[in-house]
A protein has these predicted regions:
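Peripheral, non-transmembrane regulatory/ligand-interaction domains of membrane transport proteins
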Residues: 1-207, 212-214, 220-223, 227-230, ...
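Hydrophobic alpha-helical transmembrane segments and their immediately adjacent juxtamembrane loops
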Residues: 43, 226-320
Length: 320
């Protein structure tokens, strides 16, 4: 398909976009044949091809003579997309192969951010004062900034959930908030795990790019790092809010639990004399007034007097 001077070729797992000598290839769970063909065309090192076939547990950046290889993990805001089922993925990995005139992205599941970026892709963003050398780098810059923008949307949503939880905590819905806060904590942990190594990877990329692109690209990477710092600050703010809210919720739950235990204890203390009287008059032995026709009324009066006395004591001691 051709539109806006962009040639788009799509197969089952591969989407290729060509624009004025720049190529973007997006591979989703690529087959061995697709990887081999792409690696041959762009002279991708066999070590990188091997890494593209499987997911990695850590982010990293490697500089080769013809390209830069970069791995970044991005969190999935499950509370935003409603994917809280057990076993659902909590992060997504994107492998970037950045050449001077090509960008290859590889991932192992559909990624919303890449689909959105591809749908709204504007080739005019790649025009850098007529400099062709940094076009692939500029494409990477715009793509990563878009991905970070998606994370900002997710963090804004989490912030809204925390505000909603705050209102419910102070509306006597503390128990219902325990599960919600646990879900929020899970998402914040996923964000933190995925993003904690981005800064050092981006710093390494900034150093490597000086040898690969011209100095102008250094400015764009600085903007990417600034965007990352903004996302990390949002994450830390949400985390601090969550910690304070969780402590408040736990305190209110503890107060309510203590109040409930206090009521049960007072009730047990109040009724203890009644139990003692009935147990005493139930013993198999001769008791005062046992043969009196008024013994029942005597015991009843004693029990009522004991109950009244304990109620007065509880009120005086402010147990009730």
């Amino acid at each position: 398909m051709v539109g806006n001077d962009i040639l788009i070729i799509t197969s089952l797992m591969l989407t290729r976009r060509d624009y004025k000598g720049l190529t973007w290839i997006d591979l989703e769970s690529p087959t061995e044949q697709e990887l081999t063909a792409t690696a041959t065309e762009y002279k991708i090192h066999p070590l990188v091809v091997g890494e593209l076939t499987q997911s990695s547990q850590r982010s990293k950046v490697d500089l080769y003579s013809e390209f830069i290889y970069l791995i970044l993990h991005f969190p999935i805001c499950q509370i935003y997309y409603g994917q809280q089922a057990e076993g659902s993925p909590d992060t997504e990995e994107i492998d970037f192969v950045i050449g001077r005139d090509f960008l290859i992205t590889t991932h192992y599941q559909p990624i919303v951010g890449i689909g959105e970026f591809a749908a709204s892709f504007n080739p005019n963003h790649l025009e850098d004062r007529g400099k062709d050398k940094t076009q692939a780098g500029l494409l990477f810059y715009h793509l990563v900034r878009h991905l970070y923008g998606g994370l900002a949307t997710g963090l804004d949503y989490i912030n809204g959930v925390l505000k909603q939880a705050e209102r419910k905590v102070f509306a006597n819905q503390e128990r219902a908030m325990v599960t919600l806060l646990a879900e929020v904590n899970r998402n914040l942990l996923d964000f933190r795990w995925a993003l904690k190594h981005h800064r050092e990877v981006l710093d390494s990329l900034q150093s490597a790019s000086r040898e690969f692109f011209d100095d102008g690209f250094h400015h764009y990477l600085g903007a990417v790092i600034s965007e990352y710092n903004r996302i990390w600050a949002m994450l830390e703010n949400n985390r601090e809010t969550f910690v304070d809210l969780r402590e408040t919720n736990e305190s209110l739950l503890s107060i309510k639990t203590n109040e409930t235990m206090k009521v049960f204890t007072v009730v047990a203390v109040i009724f203890f004399p009644l139990t003692l009287v009935t147990q005493f008059w139930g013993m198999n032995m001769t008791l005062p007034f046992a043969d009196s026709p008024y013994s029942y009324y005597f015991v009843l009066a004693l029990m009522l007097a004991s109950l009244f006395s304990m109620l007065v004591l509880a009120k005086y001691r402010r147990w009730l």
